[in-house]
């Protein structure tokens, strides 16, 4: 299981991430081997949330959860809801698996897959109560901006997977990316900006500050939250 999880690489196309062979600890590797069967899901298999979680509950997807601490904290604070996380980097997945076991959580499952492919192939239309995209790679060099996750096509795809009234919430500490996301998301006809002035929102209580946010604040960066509802 560990070798498959660490070496699997989806078919090539323009992606919002680059797979790097990051350092993985012994405990993370052990978690991938022993906890993946409990928490991991196969993106090639049919996904039935009621069957996976044994109940019907609001379902949140976090895309690119990093080390998973924010996702685990949210799942613990909202035990009546269910959560799925999509990440491609094994060290972060291993870290989350350890955290899920430590907290005794059973309302989280994990995919190792490109989020676009997950939305296209696994998640039915209208299935999600929330989609969270916290601190995606800003790809700040001009030649790399085509790799940014939040694009018009992605916004339409994500909106289609939200139930009516469902929330799309993105956050970034790169102002240039924040402005691009604002333009893209405000241009999606099925998403309604929840900020009073139609721009940026205050950080909702359910989003605990991440290590990326704290790092950005130490560097003097601002943080921009964008919160939308599916019409």
From Swiss-Prot:
Active site: 137
UniProt entry keywords in alphabetical sequence: Methyltransferase, S-adenosyl-L-methionine, Transferase, tRNA processing
MF annotations from Gene Ontology: tRNA (guanine(46)-N7)-methyltransferase activity
EC number assigned by the record: 2.1.1.33
Pathway as given in its UniProt record: tRNA modification; N(7)-methylguanine-tRNA biosynthesis
Catalyzed reaction equations: guanosine(46) in tRNA + S-adenosyl-L-methionine = N(7)-methylguanosine(46) in tRNA + S-adenosyl-L-homocysteine
Role this protein plays: Catalyzes the formation of N(7)-methylguanine at position 46 (m7G46) in tRNA.
Family: Belongs to the class I-like SAM-binding methyltransferase superfamily. TrmB family.
Full protein name: tRNA (guanine-N(7)-)-methyltransferase
Gene: trmB
């Amino acid at each position: 299981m560990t070798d498959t999880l660490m070496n699997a690489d989806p078919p090539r196309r323009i992606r919002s991430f680059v797979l790097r062979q990051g350092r993985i600890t012994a405990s993370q590797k052990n978690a991938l081997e022993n906890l993946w069967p409990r928490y991991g899901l196969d993106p090639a298999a049919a996904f039935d949330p009621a069957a996976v979680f044994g109940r019907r509950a609001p379902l949140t997807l976090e895309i690119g959860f990093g080390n998973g601490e924010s996702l685990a904290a949210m799942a613990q604070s909202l035990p009546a809801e269910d959560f799925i996380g999509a990440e491609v980097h094994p060290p972060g997945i291993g870290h989350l698996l350890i955290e899920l076991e430590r907290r005794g959580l059973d309302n989280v499952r994990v995919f190792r897959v490109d989020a676009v492919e997950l939305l296209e192939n696994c998640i039915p239309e209208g299935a999600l109560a929330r989609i969270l995209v916290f601190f995606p790679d800003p790809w700040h060099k001009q030649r790399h901006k085509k790799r940014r996750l939040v694009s018009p096509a992605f916004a339409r795809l994500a909106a289609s997977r939200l139930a009516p009234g469902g929330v799309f919430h993105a956050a970034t500490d790169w102002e240039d990316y924040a402005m691009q996301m604002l333009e893209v998301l405000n241009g999606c006809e099925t998403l309604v900006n929840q900020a009073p002035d139609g721009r940026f929102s205050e950080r909702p209580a359910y989003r605990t500050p991440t290590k990326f946010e704290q790092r950005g604040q130490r560097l003097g960066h601002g943080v921009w939250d964008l919160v939308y509802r599916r019409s």
